[in-house]
Amino acid sequence: MPSRGTRPEDSSVLIPTDNSTPHKEDLSSKIKEQKIVVDELSNLKKNRKVYRQQQNSNIFFLADRTEMLSESKNILDELKKEYQEIENLDKTKIKK
């Protein structure tokens, strides 16, 4: 998947002065990705197997579907909470 970041050779690209904007966009894409994961896991049939990838490796281990679903929902909630905090900070900066 191609990255959405700018390359050093792109000198004509305008860089926003607000540091939270790139983080906010990154969070937004992670939230979309996590929503898809939750949706896919929740729509699986009961007899389907789910595998978890070992971090920094190409090894996959069998995982419990319900545990993976609840873990994915928790991650989604945390991402949404962090995104909301950034939104609130942006709103307070605008008011000042």
UniProtKB/Swiss-Prot annotation:
Q: What is the lineage of its organism?
A: Eukaryota, Metazoa, Chordata, Craniata, Vertebrata
- Keywords, sorted A to Z: Coiled coil, Cytoplasm
* Protein known as: ASNSD1 upstream open reading frame protein
Q: Which organism is it from?
A: Homo sapiens
Coiled coil: which residue ranges?
23-96
Ranges for the region named Disordered are 1-28
What quaternary arrangement does the UniProt entry report? Answer: Component of the PAQosome complex which is responsible for the biogenesis of several protein complexes and which consists of R2TP complex members RUVBL1, RUVBL2, RPAP3 and PIH1D1, URI complex members PFDN2, PFDN6, PDRG1, UXT and URI1 as well as ASDURF, POLR2E and DNAAF10/WDR92.
Q: Where in the cell is it found?
A: Cytoplasm
The question of whether Coiled coil is a record keyword is answered with yes
Record InterPro entries: ASNSD1-SEP, Prefoldin
List where Basic and acidic residues composition bias occurs: 1-10
**Cross-referenced Pfam families, in alphabetical order?**
ASNSD1-SEP
Q: Which GO terms describe its biological process?
A: protein stabilization
A GO CC term attached to the entry: RPAP3/R2TP/prefoldin-like complex
